[in-house]
């Protein structure tokens, strides 16, 4: 069964990469719509809020980020709840109301805790696909627009059924937020099952093809516009350093996505940055550099030295936001610092 899944994922990857550059040469959406040129910053958070204390404090987190004059927009990398709480409509509405407190544009990419893992009895025993549909309804009511009071336009895959996959451009940097989640990208069997269901597998195949197309289109846009860097944001940690002996059976859902990022990064002249949550502990590395175990693990045939990745703090360690400063004309395009929460 697992071998068939891998073959199907590979076929989806080939289909996405041969579909063509849908939007290359288009004028890119910009977040936010204001003059570019100088240094600016954006904030990144993820795996928050977890538990009652963080839920109660989350409005203060929003207020603090709103008060940061350098931040032009915010990225939430998914997991808006912990993995052992109920995936209820009421909870989704609560977090959406908190998200609506953000003054500047908010780009939210979906995590596994809010849909993939909702089959668990302590999550309410939901059908994850029903919860995914509800997430899209609640958090993506205006496809092609970010959340936040100062909503900004972005390119969206809503016409393919994936409003959460978006891309935009700002000051010669191409950005993409793509829906890749933990739990082997949602291929871990649901409660009571020994293997993924046909419906579960079909969802993963379709979403994987869309993600690969979005990655492909983002790099195509970057080359067409002579961008200096590409930044990809997602939930899943596909290179989890906290796992000392990773098993491919737990990661094979990520393989075609890693291959697409590696292939596009290797062909791109500038730096590529990958931001993710999922593993909860801040980490910065070059996951596909020469000598990395992940090269052979994912079947990548050559190093990708221009790919950097950053994992944000989350869960119990979610006590800061990442302020990422963009230097469009500097030797290092992105720099970042962790800003402690005030309370």
Label for each model-derived stretch:
Residues 66-73, 176, 192-287:
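His/acidic metal-ligating clusters that form di-metal
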Residues 41-46, 72-78, 82, 105-110, ...:
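Structural recognition of the beta-strand scaffold that forms the well-ordered cores
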Residues 1-30:
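Secretory targeting and sorting signals
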Residues 38, 54-62, 77, 88-98, ...:
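Stable alpha-helical elements in mature extracytoplasmic
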Residues 86, 91-207, 289-318, 322-325:
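Extended active-site neighborhood of metal-dependent phosphoesterases/phosphodiesterases
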Residues 30-91, 227:
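N-terminal active-site segment of His-dependent metallophosphoesterases
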Residues 50, 63-70, 100-104, 137-144, ...:
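Sec-exported extracytoplasmic/periplasmic mature domains
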Residues 320-343:
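A short C-terminal boundary segment appended to hydrolase-like catalytic domains
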């Amino acid at each position: 069964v697992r071998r068939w899944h891998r073959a199907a994922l590979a076929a989806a990857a080939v289909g996405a990469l041969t579909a063509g550059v849908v939007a290359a040469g288009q004028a890119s959406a910009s977040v936010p719509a204001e003059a570019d040129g100088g240094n600016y910053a954006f904030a990144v958070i993820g795996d928050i809020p977890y538990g009652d204390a963080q839920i109660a404090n989350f409005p203060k987190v929003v207020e603090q980020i709103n008060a940061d004059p350098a931040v032009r927009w915010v990225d939430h990398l998914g997991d808006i709840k912990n993995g052992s709480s109920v995936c209820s409509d009421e909870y989704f509405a609560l977090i959406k109301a908190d998200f609506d407190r953000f003054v500047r544009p908010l780009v939210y990419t979906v995590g596994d805790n809010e849909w993939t893992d909702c089959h668990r009895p302590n999550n309410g025993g939901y059908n994850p696909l029903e919860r995914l549909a509800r997430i899209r309804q609640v958090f993506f009511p205006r496809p092609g627009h970010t959340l936040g009071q100062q909503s900004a336009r972005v390119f969206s895959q809503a016409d393919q059924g994936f409003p959460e996959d978006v891309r935009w451009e700002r000051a010669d940097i191409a950005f993409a937020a793509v829906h890749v989640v933990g739990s082997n990208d949602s291929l871990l069997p649901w409660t009571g099952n020994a293997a993924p269901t046909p419906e579960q597998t079909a969802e993963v195949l379709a979403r994987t093809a869309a993600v690969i197309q979005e990655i492909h289109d983002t790099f195509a846009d970057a080359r067409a516009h002579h961008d200096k860097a590409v930044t990809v944001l997602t939930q899943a940690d596909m290179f989890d350093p906290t796992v000392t002996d990773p098993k491919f059976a737990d990661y094979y859902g990520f393989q075609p996505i890693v291959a697409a990022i590696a292939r596009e990064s290797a062909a791109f002249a500038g730096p590529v940055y990958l931001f993710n949550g999922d593993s909860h502990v801040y980490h910065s590395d070059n996951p596909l550099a020469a000598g990395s175990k992940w090269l052979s693990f994912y079947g990548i045939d050559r190093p990708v030295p221009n790919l950097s990745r950053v994992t944000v703090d989350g869960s119990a360690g979610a006590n800061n936001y990442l302020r990422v400063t963009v230097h469009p004309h500097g030797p290092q395009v992105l720099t970042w610092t962790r800003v402690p929460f005030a309370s």
